[in-house]
Amino acid sequence: MENIQKLIARYPLVEDLVALKETTWFNPGATSLAQGLPYVGLTEQDVNAAHDRLARFAPYLAKAFPQTAAAGGMIESDVVAIPAMQKRLEKEYGQTIDGEMLLKKDSHLAISGSIKARGGIYEVLTHAEKLALEAGLLTTDDDYSVLLSPEFKQFFSQYSIAVGSTGNLGLSIGIMSACIGFKVTVHMSADARAWKKAKLRSHGVTVVEYEDDYGVAVEQGRKAAQSDPNCFFIDDENSRTLFLGYAVAGQRLKAQFAQQGRVVDASHPLFVYLPCGVGGGPGGVAFGLKLAFGDNVHCFFAEPTHSPCMLLGVYTGLHDAISVQDIGIDNLTAADGLAVGRASGFVGRAMERLLDGLYTLDDQTMYDMLGWLAQEEGIRLEPSALAGMAGPQRICAAAEYQQRHGFSQTQLGNATHLVWATGGGMVPEDEMEQYLAKGR
């Protein structure tokens, strides 16, 4: 406790985190893209290479997952305006939200119904390609739908994949790995929903369950993989490959906005609100957005009051050297995808200069907004996916932040507020009814 008091003396906001208060922190260390980019350790070329790899796999994905065929084997989500929800939020919070609110429906991505379909699937495909190229079974000029043949399934069945997850990452990696032909084991934390485990098992995935939180599941997955040279461990805490799979979203969104005739420039700023667990998904997406829109996009991470690992790590500068449990927070939240006590040190250090801020919200707020969105827009999400929905009203109320960035009333009126909906498209009906019943 004495250590917590010392920490609070240096970092006063920790007191609010410990008290589980809904907190907003605007990052005083935010820099321009030019200044912040070198610290990421990855470049636009890396993201372009990821884009090209996904294009090589498109013919395979279109055949393996017919639901992607219409999009030519591309796994991408719609971006939609939510004017009724915007009005509802203004009414509930008594706060005008200048500009227009949009929803990015990663919640309804093909194959696994969450943002993790981006990074998780990309890393499995990257590994499969590497093995097939090294074995001389494939060249990058081939039509990758040959990977569906029995010979390839046989080849991949010699190899296995392991991952630790609170649910959605396991779902995307499990489904994709099983489809390729890998043997796959998903190490699930106590937070993982029963339906996610059942769905994985239905695909022939081995699910190992733990009574502990996310960190333990990842550690056990890493250990199990070390003893088997043919087992590849997908490391949610440190993976650059996962990060790049998420980053592709930036260029894709830019293209979607261009199609819709939506302008993003200095006088039409873009604010993006990303739910954050360990950090890979929102970190990768934010990196991609920065490459696509430069200094005209402003990214915020959103976390549950019971799991504010990234806010704690970035705000104190301690990154993965501190966990929420170290300051007496239990890491128990209904937002199962965000129930992470220790943030990725890689993502925190890579992105700390490129984030405009982080905020927390409590479970009840997520449930309330889940209900409002279902009522107003007929869109149903899981609790984690509502974390971003609290962002626009916080930003519009933050006069000091607006002044620091020199936003005029005109700029704010022209702003786009994009809420990144991270999951919920595959939640079973009975489970969704339980969520809806908890909203006020």
Swiss-Prot record:
Its cofactor is pyridoxal 5'-phosphate. It is an enzyme of class 4 (lyase). One of its GO terms (biological process) is D-serine catabolic process. The modification N6-(pyridoxal phosphate)lysine is found at K116. GO terms for molecular function: D-serine ammonia-lyase activity; hydro-lyase activity; pyridoxal phosphate binding. It catalyses: D-serine = pyruvate + NH4(+). Keywords: Lyase, Pyridoxal phosphate. Its EC number is 4.3.1.18. HAMAP family: D_Ser_dehydrat (MF_01030). Belongs to the serine/threonine dehydratase family. DsdA subfamily. Monomer. NCBIfam families: D_Ser_am_lyase, PRK02991.1. This is D-serine dehydratase.
